[in-house]
From Swiss-Prot:
Top-rank taxon, per record: Eukaryota
Protein name in the entry: Partitioning defective protein 3
Listed Basic and acidic residues bias regions: 302-315, 322-335, 828-844, 854-869, 1030-1040, 1048-1060
Entries under Gene3D superfamilies matching the protein: 2.30.42.10, Phosphatidylinositol 3-kinase Catalytic Subunit, Chain A, domain 1
A cellular-component GO term for this protein: P granule
Taxonomic placement: Eukaryota, Metazoa, Ecdysozoa, Nematoda, Chromadorea
Keywords tagged on the record: Cell adhesion, Cell cycle, Cell division, Coiled coil, Cytoplasm, Developmental protein, Differentiation, Fertilization, Gastrulation, Gonadal differentiation, Repeat
Start-end of Polar residues biased regions: 239-256, 272-284, 967-977
Tissue: Asymmetrically distributed at the periphery of the zygote and in dividing blastomeres of the germline lineage. Coexpressed with par-6; patchy expression observed at the periphery after completion of meiosis I and in meiosis II. On completion of metaphase II, expression is restricted to the anterior 85% of embryo length; this decreases to 55% in embryos between prophase and telophase of the first mitosis. During the first cleavage, expression is detected in the advancing furrow.
């Protein structure tokens, strides 16, 4: 019940005049309302008329005559209650209105009509029955709603529970604006919704419908009643069971007021709407004195169809009850829990509940909206048909929506909303158009509203558009839901209980049928049979279970219906007879089974077609009364094809397009599917690519959220690219490339899918073939033979995926997991069975080895973590440069031979002695003196077999070093020799040996840890980018080519060969001391460019870890300070020069030994080049004050013996008679210089100063070196004066006494450059090479031609001194000397 309260009063003031003092009452007992009205009193011509609360402009004046009234409306009847006292309560108003309503209805006072409560329409506030009305209710600007019910149901006034269910969500009741401009007020939705049959009476009186009611004063003017209005009266159908066929006769109550019948010039009562059929007590209207007349009833086709179906069901029930009077009789129907009687009883109970609940019945009889396929795949188009005039609530959709934002493609993963993509339904209100349809669910997303895309609007505009749809009644309105059309069909069966496969297939309908021939094995057929009887007495038999390793596995399924066995229908047998017949079958005997399979989707489409005829075709299922034996599958059993199903291809597969939106708008995560490639192998052995198929849809991926892809779907196109004519490799490449391109410009991708026409994965597909199963063994891989037969339809499930290229082909499926694109690196095959047509074929085919497109490192095959830069793709080990470095390191580890040594190969002698403080080589003891030159031919790389002793062991005696390492046992002779048998007083590193510095143990462990860290990607990354410690293979000077290939270094030609144009053959060079086997090759010493970290390319097999340069050349001062024991003499004094007594030989002239620094001199003797002690003929030592300590070189008999065999070399080798300088140890001098330059910086070469010259000879003359020039000093005949250097220090005759008896050359103090080809200065030359420096440290090579040209001693006369190695006297100690 709604009560619209208005109040009116009269005043004695003139019309249109201002209130005067006489008009004001001085009575203090008047109510506050009367006082307010007197204050604003204005004369009005509507003193005794009803003023509607819809138009606030009507309140121009309020008569203050002390009389007011409240109009209370009960349905279509309005009751006027006089309101005189100002202190009356709300309960008194309710009682007075109810009393007058009963009296007008002719009801007795004892008839129960209960008023629950009164509410304010503006804010829904509940009025207390004991409160004074004027204190809690605004009579001018508010309205009272009375919530009532009637015991006999005769009133159409809604109950409170109905109103609560039908409250509109969007617009809550709001008070009207207090303005008197006559403009339209804000429309507010009605709280009554679509509850009553006649809503037009409420629409005019309710403030919620102001937007649809006109606010003119003529709306309420008295108008005559026409007969047309009476003919359009409301027709109410109280029962569907007894509907008169000749039309309905209705009684129209006489209106109590003219304003009740006509509002806005239109009749208030409208024709019946099928959405508001209600049972209303028509007896209450028949009591009226108004004469009745005929009215025509118009029912929609949907309602007529529903009524016809109800009549048909009732007639069937009556026949059934006549046949079976007991509902749950213990008969044949009780053998199974799921019987027709039980289902019919459930339907009857449901019908009774629906009849008891009119609201649910009305909901079930509502016209459903039309749902079609949307414009985009995965969407549905919902069309709301135009509706006649209804109440406001029936026009509203009745939904609450919330915004769904699309994340920015530039910032994937961000949570900041950027663009509105759709709106999601959060709540569905009862009574709205969507709630009455019932198929749109909470959570569905709306992407378009009446043709307007949501992504082009704001959320406020979207909500306004949804509200504006209520005003559109002349045309249909549409919504596009982001949900596939199939989901609406599946929703119909969602409320049904979950049933097993047998329960789902337990039906009388005949589905897809096939003939299966099984050969019985020793374990039977491998399935069980279950059966039931219908209410008509029919016997139905089904496949109960299929054993895992039985014959029927893969051919029969639980729930399949057995129609025939060997052509005999099973309906004439009992279950025990069928089981007995199967048991009587002999092993190896063949039996034909005609089975039928019904899918759940077909059942759902059948039920959906009865309720939504516009959306899909009615599924026609024909039940066979008797199946012919000769025709196991009649044409009537062809499965139905829905009207909206895409066109079928010749191979029986449907093609359609689907749009898959990427997750977060980016294609980096892929589609979320794993793909497989199928290859068909023909009987002739050829292979045919069958395309790319969906293997699995990953949970949570883009394809999973879209819901349109299924397993075994074939991808035949992507965007505008057709993949069908391409092979598997080309299709994979095209798909990956297109996905990458589309991901950059779009947030979704369009795929073209080909799908076989199957209802579910387990359905038996149709084909023109019979199946023969040879089940001689229970092995799951049974043999099948295919027979071409026109009267059979279905192949084996094993051959279901055969391509259209040939019926005799079988598939081998190549599969691999991927998040975006297909890849088949592993050749996986699925072996279904061996299919033969007379020729044995193996279906385990593989992709060609040459075509391996499904590569893990292929495009699009990387996981999300790898693409984000923290996976294997960002590992430096995958970078080509890093792989080259790693390959270089693995191949640059030196071994004992040029071949790579495996783990099983023994270590070389140099590797076994790695931990020793110095390098020793085990050689057989041979007599060097008796060996010939040709038989003692050693390789040049033998000089690299040695390593220098550590810095700590340099100052130790040789014996202690050797015995400390255990290589020279105590009291036994040593078998370990330094290239030759050496006496104990010889230095372990004699002249002529290469100086290789031993790496310490710490660096070795570091290298070992670096090799271990190669497997760690973070360590590898750190080392690769230079954050970690350097590896010995990471030297920038060492190119990968040098580490793999062994470069051949062309030895420089001899200067004498260039001068003589190769006319004379040079003799081999003199052997170094202690190395009579040292050299037998052609005569030149070539340059060795050492590497600071790696091996020497020329000698990769003679060292295990290469050089290790020292940080500072000053470390070699200790090496220079070390004193070697002379062969023949002891150390006389520390402050004296150390020299030795030369041993003499009868065949060789042995003179006074020359002396040379075996290392760097002490720092205080750097520039004391003139303090050279005199040397007597007797070999005694003359003491000189402040003289620099030097070491005399050893003179070896082997050298003399060697040069006696080479007469042409003796003269040049021994420069002058009696001079020991000819046998000077230049090898050891080179080692000293080598050690010095190896520890210095770039250009830290020493200065070679001749004892006979006045100026030093710099080895840094790069230009002269490149031109082949050398530094020579020309002798001056007859000159005996002592030469001086640049600083004026005396260097005469190499510090040999002037009275020396030894003979030698005398030189002038003049230095010049001489061309090496000119042959000046005794035809000799000295050629120097610039050392190659790497990383500031390098091993330099100083080569002197001592083949055809002997060494230049640069000494003069007997007792003359050889060259001296010294530092430069000026400039930085580690800088290259500058000119």
């Amino acid at each position: 019940m709604s009560a619209s309260s208005t109040s009116s009063s009269s005043t004695s003031c003139p019309e249109g005049g201002e209130p005067s003092g006489s008009c004001k009452s001085s009575d203090e007992g008047e109510s506050t309302l009367k006082k307010r009205m007197q204050q604003y009193g204005i004369a009005s011509g509507y003193a005794n008329s009803s003023i509607s609360t819809l138009d606030r402009s009507q309140y121009q004046s309020l008569p203050l005559n002390g009389t007011r009234r409240v109009t209370v409306q009960f349905g279509r009847m309005k009751i006027v209650v006089p309101w005189k006292e100002s202190d009356q309560t709300v309960g008194q108003l309710a009682d007075a209105a109810l009393l007058r309503y009963k009296k007008a209805r002719g009801m007795a006072n004892e008839d129960r009509i209960h008023v629950h409560r009164l509410e304010c329409a503006s804010d829904g506030g509940i009025l207390d029955m004991d409160d004074v009305l004027e204190e809690v209710f605004d009579l001018n600007y508010d309205q009272i709603l009375a919530i009532t019910d009637e015991a006999n149901g005769g009133s159409t006034t809604p109950t409170y529970s109905q109103i609560q269910k039908q409250q509109h969500h969007y617009a809550q009741p709001l008070p009207y604006a207090r303005k008197f401009d006559g403009g339209p007020s804000t429309p507010i939705a009605s709280a009554f919704g679509s509850v009553t049959v006649n809503h037009q009476a409420h629409r005019a009186a309710s403030p919620y419908n102001v937007g649809f009611a006109r606010s003119n004063s003529r709306d309420f003017a008295p108008q005559p009643t026409h007969s047309k209005e009476r003919r359009d009266s409301v027709v109410e159908v109280s029962s569907f069971d007894q509907i008169p066929q000749s039309g309905l006769r209705v009684s129209t109550p006489k209106p109590s007021r003219q304003s009740e019948d006509v509002i806005d010039g239109k009749p208030m009562n409208q024709p019946i709407l099928r959405s508001s059929l209600r049972t209303e007590a028509s007896g209450s209207r028949t009591e009226e004195a108004t004469p009745v007349k005929q009215s025509r009833v118009t029912l929609s086709p949907e309602v007529e169809k529903k009524l016809a179906e109800q009549d048909e069901r009732k007639s069937e029930r009556r026949k059934h009850y006549d046949k079976n009077p007991g509902r749950f009789a213990r008969g044949s129907d009780r053998k199974s829990r799921i019987t027709d009687a039980l289902l019919d009883a459930r339907d009857r109970i449901a019908d009774q509940l629906e009849s008891q609940n009119p609201a649910e019945e009305t909901k079930s009889q509502m016209i459903r909206v039309k749902i079609d396929q949307g414009p985009m795949p995965g969407t549905s188009l919902v069309t709301f048909p135009p509706i006649p005039e209804k109440s406001e609530n029936e026009k509203q959709l009745g939904i609450e929506v919330n915004a769904v934002f699309d994340e920015s493609s530039e910032l994937p993963g961000t949570s900041e909303p950027t663009k509105l993509s759709s709106v999601q339904i959060m709540k569905i209100e009862d009574g709205g158009r969507i709630a009455k349809d019932g198929r749109i669910r909470v959570g569905d997303c709306i992407v378009a509203i009446d043709g307007k895309p949501v992504d082009q609007m704001s959320i406020i505009r979207v909500r306004a558009s949804i509200s504006d749809l209520a005003a559109v009644t002349s045309r249909p309105v549409t919504l596009i839901i982001n949900r596939s059309l199939e989901s609406f069909l599946e929703q119909e069966s969602s409320a049904k209980p979950i049933q097993s496969a047998l329960q789902q297939a337990n039906t009388q309908y005949i589905g897809h049928t096939t003939v299966v021939e099984l050969i019985k094995s020793s374990n039977g057929f491998g399935f069980t049979v279950t059966g039931r009887e219908t209410a008509k007495g029919e016997r139905l038999f089904y496949i109960g279970t299929v054993k895992p390793y039985g014959v029927a596995l893969g051919h029969l399924k639980s729930g399949d219906r057995l129609l025939e066995i060997n052509g005999t229908p099973t309906g004439q047998w009992t279950q025990s007879e069928i089981v007995e017949k199967l048991k009587e079958t002999m092993v190896g005997e063949k039996i034909k089974f005609l089975v039928s399979r019904v899918s759940q989707s077909a059942i759902m489409s059948t039920s959906a077609s009865s309720e939504n005829k516009e959306n899909e075709e009615t599924l026609k299922v024909v039940e066979e009364e008797k199946i012919p034996q000769k025709l196991p599958l009649p044409a009537l059993m062809t499965p139905p094809v829905p009207k909206d199903t895409p066109a079928l291809s010749p191979s029986g597969a449907s093609r359609f397009e689907i749009v898959i939106p990427f997750i977060n708008g980016s294609s980096s995560a892929g589609l979320g599917v794993s793909l497989k490639a199928r290859v068909s192998k023909k009987s002739n052995g050829s292979k045919v690519d069958c395309g790319i198929f969906i293997k699995n849809v990953m949970h949570g991926g883009a394809a999973f959220k879209e819901g349109g892809l299924r397993v075994d779907d074939r991808i035949v196109g992507v965007e505008d690219i057709d993949l069908e004519p391409l092979d598997n490799r080309e299709a994979q490449a095209a798909l990956a490339k297109k996905l990458k391109e589309v991901g950059m410009i779009s947030s979704n991708v369009r795929l073209t899918i080909s799908r076989y026409n199957e209802c579910n994965p387990g359905q038996i597909s149709r084909d023109l073939s019979r199946i023969t199963v040879d089940a001689s063994s229970p092995s799951p891989s049974s043999r099948m033979s295919s027979h071409t037969a026109p009267d059979s339809l279905l192949p084996s499930p094993a051959t279901r995926g055969t391509s259209s290229s040939g019926a005799d082909s079988s598939h081998s499926r190549q599969s691999s997991a991927s998040s975006a694109v297909p890849a088949v690196p592993a050749r996986l095959t699925e072996r279904d069975s061996i299919v033969s047509d007379g020729t044995s074929r193996n279906d385990e085919s593989e992709l060609p080895d040459s075509a391996d497109p499904f590569n893990r490192e292929g495009l699009g095959r990387k996981s999300l973590s790898e693409k984000r830069g923290m996976g294997a793709a960002a590992d430096p080990q995958h970078i080509k440069l890093f792989q080259d470095i790693k390959h270089q390191r693995q191949n640059s580890a030196p071994t004992s031979s040029t071949q790579k040594r495996s783990k099983s190969q023994p270590r070389s002698s140099s590797q076994r002695n790695y931990r020793s403080p110095m390098k020793l080589v085990d050689l057989p003891t041979t007599a060097a003196a008796s060996a010939s030159t040709n038989s003692q031919n050693l390789d040049d790389s033998d000089m690299l077999n040695r390593r220098s002793q550590s810095m700590e062991s340099i100052n130790r005696p040789v014996e202690s070093i050797l015995r400390g390492t255990g290589q020279i046992p105590t009291g036994s002779s040593s078998k370990v020799q330094f290239m030759q048998a050496a006496s104990p007083d010889q230095h372990p590193f004699p002249p002529g040996a290469a100086l290789l510095r031993l790496k310490n143990e710490e660096s070795r462990s570091r290298d070992k840890s670096r090799r271990k860290s190669m497997g760690n990607p973070f360590s590898a990354m750190r080392n690769f980018f230079g954050f970690g410690s350097k590896s010995r293979d990471a030297s920038p000077e060492k190119t990968p080519t040098e580490s793999v290939q062994l470069r051949s270094v062309e030895r420089p030609k001899s200067i004498i060969d260039e001068r003589n144009n190769g006319s004379s053959e040079r003799a081999p060079p003199p052997l170094p001391p202690h190395q009579s086997q040292r050299r037998g090759s052609g005569g030149n010493v070539f340059v060795d460019y050492g590497e600071p970290y790696g091996l020497i390319p020329q000698y990769p097999h003679n060292t295990t870890s290469g050089y290790e340069s020292y940080a500072d050349s000053e470390l070699y001062d200790r090496y220079a300070a070390h004193r070697y024991h002379p062969r023949g003499g002891p150390i006389i004094d520390e402050d004296e020069y150390i020299y030795r007594q030369q041993s003499t030989s009868g065949n060789s002239p042995i003179n006074t030994s020359s002396y040379v620094n075996y290392g760097l001199p002490a720092s205080n003797a750097y520039h004391v080049g003139s303090r050279i002690p005199p040397q007597t003929s007797s070999g005694s030592i003359s003491k000189t004050s402040g003289a620099m300590r030097r070491v005399y070189p050893a003179e070896y008999d082997e050298d003399v013996a060697y040069h006696q065999q080479i007469p042409q070399q003796s003269t040049r080798y021994q420069q002058g008679s009696g001079s020991g300088r000819g046998n000077a140890d230049y090898h050891h001098m080179f080692n000293s210089w080598f050690a010095y330059t190896g520890g210095g910086a770039v250009g830290a070469a020493p200065v070679i100063k001749s004892s006979y010259g006045s100026s030093p000879v710099r080895i840094a003359a790069a230009s002269a070196i490149e031109r082949g020039e050398s530094f020579v000093v020309e002798p001056v005949s007859g000159s005996s004066a002592s030469a001086t250097d640049r600083r004026g220090r005396s260097t005469s005759s190499g510090a040999v006494a002037s009275g020396s008896s030894s003979t030698g050359f005398q030189y002038a103090a003049k230095e010049k450059y001489a061309d090496a080809r000119s042959g000046k200065f005794n035809g000799g030359s000295t050629r120097l090479f610039i050392p190659r420096h790497g990383g500031g440290l390098s091993a330099a090579a100083f080569a002197t031609n001592f083949g055809g040209e002997a060494y230049e001693t640069r000494g003069g006369g007997a007792g003359g001194s050889p060259s001296q190695y010294r530092r430069r006297d000026q400039g930085p100690p580690h800088r290259f000397p500058q000119y």
